[in-house]
């Protein structure tokens, strides 16, 4: 049966007498409770290692569908859609940015005999499995129709991301109970390895093995028009794999069971958490921290493919970067125990440099593509961008794990991750639409063709014409992004990061209001 705890949650207006009596001790403990304290490294037990591998598996299950939605599907769609269609498709990622709305339900309602987290993880995995299986029978048709089916793609992807986001709430909360407080940085490492591996499989590996050119060049002796695998077959495989993994989760021991507040109190807890001064300042970092990057990072590789970079070469670039990303993620997780936001800030400035290099690269390739070597400059720019993105992602994950209140672990981590995901979702739609609206192009022999999609460009070439760009929205949005990234960081983000780095960990917890009120 479903169990719902009825303990009272603590807010600024609702403080228990026994808490006030213990407040002086709490105040004294805060003195050494700071993010600058390096917790050191404690050896992992065999059970904790198993838990880390288990977390990697759960995050892998999330990473595979997210790699499809955020990685390979836009590339399969690109020949038949415009930037505006891609902007519409980007809305599918919004459940990750809105999951805080239903996180209290995930944290509050569960089957006590089955397990607080397994109650949600197992059904979510089964839904992911069934959704992938159904989609595998329609994906080829939707891709071939392009813009005509963009709404179907977006709707399916939205539902899939919604289920993944719900699972993420439960897994984030579960990770806080699997490891000791001084080892929580491993949770961020597990998340990085799992999500990156899933994304890598659904992006790089998928693009390579669905490519007929790759198979004909390196593997087959007799050429064929099909790759080694099909997109529908790949999706079907992961549907079955996820189902099998869900059976494993059913038998996994879930310890450290905690009874929690009812859903009404959980909503009050969210409101109390969002009312924290630190949280309001962190909101600035999250909502504005990716404004300058999303459009450039999304469009640069797509522009490179327009100028002759094949999907095979793109996959090779990402393939080479994959082990680097994993190693860098593990290393960043270790060094981020001490002042993780400082590490994040260094990654921010690195990304500013990388998007500037991206813009210069695209300009050079577009003007001298017959004399300019495409692969190595793109490889360098992608490596820089991916490395700094990984540094930011892992450092922020460590920071979230350190400041999260274990009493409401799933909900608190969801609040933090929601703020982070929202910062990457809302500017993407705006900037992609801007890039499309600012682009003015036409075909030299058929002015009615706008060359907004690859299919129109091929049609223009078939008519004996070339695409003429009076204005390319890519450069304008990139320049605007660079300006926003620098100005926002200097005026807002850097001062906030300096303040948050010095804040005690207890000041992030709801119960810290007890000591604050007592004093």
Curated annotation (Swiss-Prot):
UniProt xrefs under Gene3D superfamilies: MFS general substrate transporter like domains
Main location: membrane
Location within or outside the cell: Membrane
Topology with respect to the bilayer: Multi-pass membrane protein
UniProt GO BP: acetyl-CoA transmembrane transport
Keywords: Membrane, Transmembrane, Transmembrane helix, Transport
SUPFAM superfamilies in the record: MFS general substrate transporter (SSF103473)
Segment forming the signal sequence: none
UniProt GO MF annotations: acetyl-CoA transmembrane transporter activity
Residues spanning the membrane: 52-72, 86-106, 119-139, 156-176, 199-219, 231-251, 313-333, 343-363, 374-394, 408-430, 477-497
Single GO cellular component term: Golgi apparatus
Name of the protein this chain belongs to: Uncharacterized protein C21B10.09
Organism whose genome encodes this protein: Schizosaccharomyces pombe (strain 972 / ATCC 24843) (Fission yeast)
């Amino acid at each position: 049966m479903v169990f719902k705890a009825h303990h009272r949650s603590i807010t600024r207006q609702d403080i228990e007498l026994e808490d006030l009596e213990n407040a002086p001790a709490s105040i004294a403990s805060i003195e050494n409770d700071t993010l600058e304290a390096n917790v050191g490294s404690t050896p992992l037990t065999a059970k904790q290692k198993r838990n880390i591998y288990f977390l990697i598996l759960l995050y892998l299950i999330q990473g595979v569908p997210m790699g499809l939605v955020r990685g390979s599907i836009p590339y399969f769609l690109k020949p038949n859609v415009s930037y505006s269609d891609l902007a519409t498709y980007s809305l599918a990622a919004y459940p990750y940015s809105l999951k805080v709305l239903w996180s209290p339900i995930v944290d509050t309602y569960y089957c006590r005999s089955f397990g607080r987290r397994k109650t949600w993880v197992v059904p979510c995995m089964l839904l992911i499995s069934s959704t992938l299986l159904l989609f595998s029978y329609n994906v080829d048709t939707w891709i071939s129709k392009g813009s005509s089916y963009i709404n179907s793609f977006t709707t399916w992807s939205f539902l899939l991301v919604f289920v993944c986001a719900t699972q993420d709430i439960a897994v984030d909360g579960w990770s806080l109970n699997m490891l000791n407080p001084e080892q929580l940085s491993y949770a961020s490492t597990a998340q990085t390895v799992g999500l990156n591996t899933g994304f890598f499989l659904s992006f790089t590996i998928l693009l390579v093995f669905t490519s007929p050119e790759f198979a004909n060049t390196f593997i087959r002796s007799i050429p064929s028009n099909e790759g080694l695998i099909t997109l529908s077959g790949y999706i079907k495989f992961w549907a079955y794999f996820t189902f099998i993994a869900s059976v494993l989760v059913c038998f996994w021991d879930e310890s450290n069971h905690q009874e929690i507040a009812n859903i009404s109190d959980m909503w009050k807890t969210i409101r109390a958490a969002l009312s924290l001064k630190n949280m309001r300042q962190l909101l600035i970092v999250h909502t504005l921290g990716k404004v300058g990057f999303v459009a450039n990072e999304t469009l640069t590789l797509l522009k490179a493919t327009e100028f002759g970079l094949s999907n095979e070469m793109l996959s090779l670039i990402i393939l080479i970067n994959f082990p680097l990303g994993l190693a860098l993620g593990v290393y960043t997780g270790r060094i981020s125990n001490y002042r993780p936001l400082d590490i994040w800030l260094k990654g921010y400035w690195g990304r500013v440099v990388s998007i500037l290099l991206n813009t210069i690269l695209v300009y050079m390739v577009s003007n001298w593509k017959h004399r300019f070597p495409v692969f190595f400059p793109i490889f360098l720019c992608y490596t820089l961008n991916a490395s700094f993105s990984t540094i930011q992602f892992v450092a922020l994950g460590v920071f979230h794990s350190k400041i999260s209140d274990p009493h409401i672990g799933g909900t608190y981590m969801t609040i933090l991750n929601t703020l982070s995901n929202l910062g990457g979702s809302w500017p993407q739609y705006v900037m992609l639409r801007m890039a499309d609206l600012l682009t003015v192009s036409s075909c030299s022999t058929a002015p009615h063709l706008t060359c907004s999609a690859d299919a129109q460009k091929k049609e223009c070439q078939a008519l004996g014409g070339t695409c003429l760009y009076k204005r390319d929205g890519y450069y304008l949005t990139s320049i605007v992004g660079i300006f926003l990234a620098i100005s926002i960081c200097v005026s807002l983000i850097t001062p906030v990061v300096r303040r948050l780095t010095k804040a005690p960990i207890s000041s992030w917890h709801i119960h810290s209001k007890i000591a604050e009120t007592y004093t």
